[in-house]
From Swiss-Prot:
Serine protease that may be involved in the light-dependent degradation of antenna and photosystem II in chloroplasts. May function during high light acclimation in plastids. It comes from Arabidopsis thaliana (Mouse-ear cress). CDD domains: S49_SppA_67K_type (cd07018), S49_Sppa_N_C (cd07023). The keyword Ligase does not apply. The keyword Ribonucleoprotein does not apply. Residues 70-90 have a biased composition (Basic and acidic residues). This is Serine protease SPPA, chloroplastic. The active site is at S460. Keywords: Chloroplast, Hydrolase, Membrane, Plastid, Protease, Serine protease, Stress response, Thylakoid, Transit peptide. GO terms for cellular component: chloroplast; chloroplast envelope; chloroplast stroma; chloroplast thylakoid; chloroplast thylakoid membrane; mitochondrion. Belongs to the peptidase S49 family. Disulfide bonds: none annotated. Residues 63-94 are annotated as: Disordered.
C-alpha cells in the first residue's frame, strides 16, 4: 500500500486570510495536487541550437572557479544574446494606450453595428454591468459554462473602452477566492479602461482586502449602510498532522531535498519549521506591502496613513467614508438612480444596461478591434498536471499533457504563427507529464519565440513548463519557483496492530518491497535508495532550471531548495525575466518575433471551450452530472476551507488509493480522520 511520493511541490502553501477567516490568497486551493516524480525520470537529450534560444553557459553545470576574463566573456555573450542580460525595463511594457478613432473608423464601426445579430446589439448610452465573485478561471468558457472567465472579462473591458454605445461600467465586487495574480490583472484592466475617459463605478458589500484593492481602482466606490468591512490585515495559517498520525498509528518517513520543502513537515511535524516560517513571512510581507502601495496610489493617501487605518480595526463602513476610502454610502438602487441622472435618463425609464454574459457575445470585429495579419498563438495551461484525462476531469480543471502537447506541436508545425504564449496557472502535478511538456515547449522555442505568462501560480511543474520558454513574465504576486523534492512513505505497523489487520508479503528482488511493504520501516539499504532517488530527481530539476536560466548551479541552488517566491522576488533572483500580465507577454512576443510594437496582431486562442456533450453537461452543474460532480465540488470547497487537511487527502489518499489492494485501508483511514474534524 505504501507508495513513494517524490514531490516537486511538496509543501502546501497555507492559506493567507483576513481575520474574517476567508481565504485571501486561496493558496491551499492552488496547491491542490503535488508534483509526483517517477524514480525512472530521465534526462532529455542535448539542446538544439536556435536563434531564439538563450546562450547557455558551459559553467551552468560546472562549479569550478573561472578567471575574471572568462566570466566577463560569458557576461558579454549573455548580453549579446538579448535574453539573460536584459533588465525588466529593457522589455516593452505592453501597457494599453487608448487611441481615439478617426472619422472613417467611426463610420465603419457604426455601419457594422447596423448588421449585428439581435443578441449582439446594445442600446446607445448603456452601462456595462459586471459582478466579480468567487473563483475566476484563466480558461475560456463557452456559453454553457457558468462562472467568470478572466480572458472574457479582460476582453469586455477592452471592448467597452472602444464601444461608442457603452457610457461606462458599473462593477459589483463580491467576495473573491481567486489568487492575487488574477486580482492584479483585473486591476490593470480597470486602470486601462479609465484611460478611455469613461466612468467606472464600483459597488462593494463585503469589503475584504482583495475586494477593496479592486474597488479603490475605480473612479468611485460605493457601499450600502449594512456593508461588512474586514480591512484588518493578513494572516497565514499552517496545519500539521504529526500528532494525528501519532495517535492513529501512522509513522511518516519523510526525506526532504531542499530546506524550504514543507509538505513533509505537514505530515511529520507538530509545529512550523524555522525555514517554512521564514518563507511564509516573506510571502506575507510581499502581499501586504503590495496592497498598501496599491491602495496608497489609488486613494492618494500616504502609505503609513493607510496602514494606521488598518491597525485601528475598523469595522463600520462609515469610517471608510470618513477616511476617504469610499465615495459614499448608498444602496444599489440609489447608485443606479445617480447614474440615471448623470446620463440624462428620465426618472420613469430604466437605466440601459448590458450584462457580462450578453456583452461577451459582442464580436470585436463589430467594434473594429480585429488584429493584423501576423498571428500569435495563445496556449492556456491551467490546473494540476497529469498525463492523461481522469474520469472526473472537467474542462479547464487540469493540464492534460497529451492534449497540451498536441496543441504545442500544431503551433510548431504551422507557419502561420509568428510566436506563441504559454499562459500557465498551475501548482504542478505529474513530473513525467511536466517533463514531456517541457520538451515540446523547448522544441517550439527553437522554431519561434515562446513567452511564458504566469497567472496566480506557476510553481513546481508549472515553473518546469515555463523554463523552456524564451522569456518568462509573471505578476508581482504570482507564486512561482518551488524547485525541490520531498519523498514521503508511511509505515503502518502500529495502525495495523490497533485494528487487527495483518499483511503478508512475498517478493522477489532486493528492492521489490520498497514501495509496497508499509507494514515495516525501511531497511538501511532501502532507505539509502529511497534518498538517492529523491536526490536524483531534485538534481535533474535544479540543473535544468540552472541551464534554462543561464545560471551556475551553485547560484540556482541558493534560490531553489523548494522555496516559493512571489513574482517580484523571483525576478530579482533571475527566475523570471519581466513583471507584468498577459499584455506584456504579448508585447515581448512581438519584440522577439520582430513585429513592430505598434503593429496589430491577431491572437489565436488554441484552448477554445469544448462543445462536446459531456463537457457541456459538466458545465451545467451537479444536477445533471450527478453524484460524481457534486462530490468533486465538495472536495474543491474543502480544499479551500480546510487547507492542509484536504490537501493531505489529495497527496496521501488520492495517490495511494490508486492501489486496489490499499483501497479498503485507505477508506478506513479517511473515515477515521474525517471523524476527528
Amino acid at each position: 500500500m505504501a507508495k513513494l511520493l517524490l514531490l516537486h511541490a511538496p509543501h502546501v502553501i497555507p492559506r493567507f486570510s483576513s481575520s474574517s477567516s476567508r481565504s485571501l490568497v486561496s493558496a491551499a486551493a492552488l496547491y491542490r495536487r503535488p508534483l509526483l516524480v517517477n524514480p525512472q525520470f530521465s534526462h532529455i537529450g542535448p539542446r538544439l541550437h536556435s536563434p531564439y534560444n538563450r546562450r547557455f553557459s558551459a559553467r551552468a553545470f560546472d562549479d569550478s572557479p573561472a578567471s575574471s576574463a572568462e566570466m566577463e566573456k560569458e557576461k558579454q555573450e549573455q548580453l549579446l544574446d538579448g535574453v539573460s542580460g536584459k533588465k525588466d525595463e529593457d522589455y516593452p511594457t505592453g501597457e494599453m494606450e487608448y487611441e481615439n478613432r478617426n472619422a472613417w473608423e467611426i463610420f465603419v464601426v457604426k455601419f457594422r453595428m447596423l448588421f449585428a445579430y439581435p443578441w449582439q446589439r446594445v442600446r446607445k448610452g448603456s452601462v456595462l454591468t459586471m459582478t466579480l465573485r468567487g473563483q475566476i478561471s484563466d480558461q475560456l468558457k463557452s456559453r454553457f459554462n457558468s462562472g467568470l472567465s478572466l480572458p472574457q472579462l479582460s476582453e469586455n473591458f477592452v471592448k467597452a473602452a472602444y464601444d461608442p454605445r457603452i457610457a461606462g461600467v458599473y462593477l459589483h465586487i463580491d467576495p473573491l477566492s481567486c489568487g492575487w495574480g488574477k486580482v492584479e490583472e483585473i486591476r490593470r484592466h480597470i486602470l486601462n479602461f479609465k484611460k478611455s475617459g469613461k466612468f467606472i463605478v464600483g459597488y462593494i458589500s463585503i469589503c475584504g482586502l482583495k475586494e477593496y484593492y479592486l474597488g479603490c481602482a475605480c473612479n468611485e466606490l460605493f457601499a450600502p449602510p449594512s456593508a461588512y468591512s474586514f480591512l484588518y490585515g493578513l494572516t497565514v495559517q499552517a496545519s500539521f498532522l504529526g500528532g494525528v498520525f501519532e495517535k492513529v498509528g501512522i509513522e511518516p518517513q519523510v526525506q526532504r531535498i531542499g530546506k524550504y520543502k514543507s509538505a513533509g513537515d505537514q505530515l511529520s511535524r507538530k509545529s512550523i519549521s524555522e525555514e517554512n516560517y521564514e518563507m511564509l513571512s516573506v510571502l506575507l510581507d510581499n502581499i501586504y506591502s503590495n496592497w498598501l502601495d496599491g491602495v496608497s496610489d489609488a486613494t492618494g493617501k500616504k502609505r503609513e496613513d493607510v496602514e494606521n487605518f488598518i491597525n485601528q480595526g475598523v469595522y463600520e463602513i462609515e469610517k471608510l467614508k470618513e477616511a476617504g476610502l469610499i465615495k459614499d454610502i448608498r444602496y444599489d438602487d440609489e447608485v443606479i438612480t445617480m447614474l440615471k441622472e448623470r446620463l440624462g435618463v428620465e426618472k420613469d425609464k430604466k437605466l440601459p444596461t448590458v450584462d457580462y454574459k450578453k456583452y461577451s457575445g459582442v464580436k470585436k470585429w463589430t467594434l473594429g478591434l480585429t488584429g493584423g495579419r501576423d498571428q500569435i498563438a495563445i496556449i492556456r495551461a491551467g490546473g494540476s498536471i497529469s498525463r492523461v484525462k481522469g474520469p472526473l476531469s472537467t474542462p479547464g480543471s487540469a493540464i492534460i499533457a497529451e492534449q497540451l502537447i498536441e496543441k504545442i506541436r500544431s503551433v510548431r508545425e504551422s507557419k502561420k504563427y509568428k510566436a506563441a504564449i504559454i499562459r500557465i496557472d498551475s501548482p504542478g502535478g505529474d513530473a513525467l507529464a511536466s517533463d514531456l511538456m517541457w520538451r515540446e515547449i523547448k522544441l517550439l522555442a527553437e522554431t519561434k519565440p515562446v513567452i511564458a505568462s504566469m497567472s496566480d501560480v506557476a510553481a513546481s511543474g508549472g515553473y518546469y513548463m515555463a523554463m523552456a520558454a524564451n522569456a518568462i513574465v509573471a505578476e508581482n504576486l504570482t507564486l512561482t519557483g518551488s524547485i525541490g523534492v520531498v519523498t514521503a512513505r508511511f509505515t503502518l505497523a502500529k495502525l495495523y496492530e490497533k485494528i487487527g489487520f495483518n499483511k503478508e508479503t512475498i517478493s522477489r528482488g532486493k528492492y521489490a518491497e520498497l514501495l509496497g511493504a508499509e507494514e515495516r520501516p525501511l531497511k538501511p539499504e532501502e532507505a539509502e535508495l529511497f534518498e538517492k532517488s529523491a536526490q536524483h530527481a531534485y538534481q535533474l530539476f535544479r540543473d535544468k532550471a540552472a541551464l534554462s536560466r543561464s545560471m551556475p548551479v551553485d547560484k540556482m541552488e541558493e534560490v531553489a531548495q523548494g522555496r516559493v517566491w512571489t513574482g517580484k522576488d523571483a525576478h530579482s533572483r533571475g527566475l523570471i525575466d519581466a513583471v507584468g500580465g498577459l499584455s506584456r507577454a504579448i508585447a515581448i512576443a512581438k519584440q522577439k518575433a520582430n513585429i513592430p510594437l505598434n503593429k496589430k496582431v491577431t491572437l489565436v486562442e488554441l484552448s477554445r471551450p469544448s462543445t462536446s456533450l459531456p463537457d457541456i453537461l459538466s458545465g451545467i452543474g451537479s444536477s445533471v452530472i450527478g453524484v460524481d460532480r457534486t462530490l468533486k465540488g465538495l472536495l474543491d470547497e474543502l480544499t479551500i476551507t480546510e487547507g492542509v487537511q484536504a490537501r493531505m487527502d489529495g497527496i496521501m489518499f488520492q495517490q495511494l488509493g490508486r492501489d486496489s489492494l490499499a483501497t479498503p485501508i485507505i477508506d478506513m483511514l479517511k473515515d477515521y480522520l474525517s471523524s476527528l474534524r
